[in-house]
Regions:
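Solvent-exposed interaction patches of small proteins and small membrane subunits
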Residues: 1-119
Length: 119
């Protein structure tokens, strides 16, 4: 089994990538830019996949993070793509991802204080 530390690093990297992809965009620009939307959606899927790979025990130990909602969002994106509401994706990227990144970073440092790089 892949170490949970690596999934946390994946989530942080994907969150950072979301911020990079939306930099310089406002809501209307994002909604009109299919390339940026696809990139952000991919990173949100990576975040959800990483969250789904964490053990239940790990997720229970960190209840402040809405793990189930993150995984459910990933599942919706993957299985119900044509029902996506792009303004919700924008709000997720701009409002929720930065908070999640801070939460996951704090968990990483608390759980694995000597190891914050993938190697």
């Amino acid at each position: 089994m892949r170490p949970e530390r690596l999934y946390l690093l994946d989530i942080i990297e994907a969150a950072d990538n979301v911020v990079i992809h939306i930099a310089g965009h406002d809501r209307e620009c994002f909604l009109g830019d299919v390339t940026t939307r696809a990139a952000v959606l991919h990173e949100l899927t990576v975040i959800g996949e990483g969250a789904s790979r964490l053990t239940e025990d790990f997720r229970i130990r960190h209840p402040a993070v809405p793990w189930a909602k993150i995984v459910a969002f990933r599942n919706f994106v993957v299985h119900e793509y044509f029902g996506l509401d792009w303004p919700i994706v924008w709000n997720t990227a701009t409002d929720l991802v930065p908070i999640l990144r801070l939460q996951v970073s704090a968990i990483l440092h608390a759980e694995f204080p000597d190891s914050t790089s993938p190697s």
